[in-house]
Amino acid sequence: MASGLTRLLLRGPRCLLATAGLTLIPPVRGVKKGFRAAFRFQKELERWRLLRCPPPPVRRSEKPNWDYHAEIQAFGPRLQETFSLDLLKTAFVNSCYIKSEEAKRQKLGIEKEAVLLNLKDNQELSEQGTSFSQTCLTQFFEDAFPDLPTEGVKSLVDYLTGEEVVCHVARNLAVEQLTLSADFPVPPAVLRQTFFAVIGALLHSSGPERTSLFIRDFLITQMTGKELFEIWKIINPMGLLVQELKKRNISVPESRLTRQSGSTTALPVYFVGLYCDKKLIAEGPGETVLVAEEEAARVALRKLYGFTENRQPWDYSRPKEPVRAEKTIAAS
């Protein structure tokens, strides 16, 4: 310690003044680094908490800046369609909403005459929209794929009018936000009924031709990238192929193993070809010979039905003929 004091005295008064000057520097003003780190940690913790336990969904009508009448009026122009305002309002009213509102009024002790709401539900519009949509889609598929049997057409129509596809389209068109339902989020069955009620309202407002274009633009487009037998489930493709070939007076197909690879490994692959009159009509791969034969039968059926992967895409630019629309409304 004495040696350190001696060095300090030998350096002179400048060193003493320098050290004294360092102690006189005022502290830095501002947010400390420790506080910033704690604030960032708190924000990150809150974000993870919201991801882990998200808050329950809230109706759009319960949030600020909401005008239901203005939203109803803007629904048609946003889709470039013309709706009757009264029909469109009716299309969004479900029977479960009417029952729940009447039950709430009864709990408040309101008189029976005042309990009843002067509203009409969308049941009738939904039935008309469903019937027209199924008929219109059936005609679309029959015109586009004339060789496709009735069972295949029905499977495609059922797929496009099912809850999964219809609810996906309805949510992207903001139908869910305008739907008057007792529960939220809106149940899929109620949302599907509401969407077809909107189609029924469009049918009465703009006619069958505009409604068929609406169905083409929003439902047929959901077939993009879809494979036929992902939608139409076939248990015995070879048996169906034999029936189709008999209708066309073609001999029964014969299956032959054309190629194989890795047959002694864990991931083998086989290629089976189907021959009719010594001509190769289809070839399909599979992990076993039986699976490859079934895949070859599916490939042959796609060729017969005109539903191949390299088929011509759907024409959305050409307007539909009014005669077809008249046939659709007459059939529905």
UniProtKB/Swiss-Prot annotation:
Residues 1-30 form a transit peptide. Pfam families: DSRM_MRPL44 (PF22892), RM44_endonuclase (PF22935). It is an enzyme of class 3 (hydrolase). Its EC number is 3.1.26.-. GO terms for biological process: mitochondrial translational elongation; RNA processing. Residues 86-228 form the RNase III domain. Residues 236-306 form the DRBM domain. CDD domains: DSRM_MRPL44 (cd19874). It is found in: Mitochondrion. One of its GO terms (cellular component) is nucleus. The keyword Ligase does not apply. Keywords: Endonuclease, Hydrolase, Mitochondrion, Nuclease, Ribonucleoprotein, Ribosomal protein, RNA-binding, Transit peptide. One of its GO terms (molecular function) is double-stranded RNA binding. Belongs to the ribonuclease III family. Mitochondrion-specific ribosomal protein mL44 subfamily. Component of the 39S subunit of mitochondrial ribosome. May have a function in the assembly/stability of nascent mitochondrial polypeptides exiting the ribosome. Component of the mitochondrial ribosome large subunit (39S) which comprises a 16S rRNA and about 50 distinct proteins. This is Large ribosomal subunit protein mL44. The lineage of its organism: Eukaryota, Metazoa, Chordata, Craniata, Vertebrata.
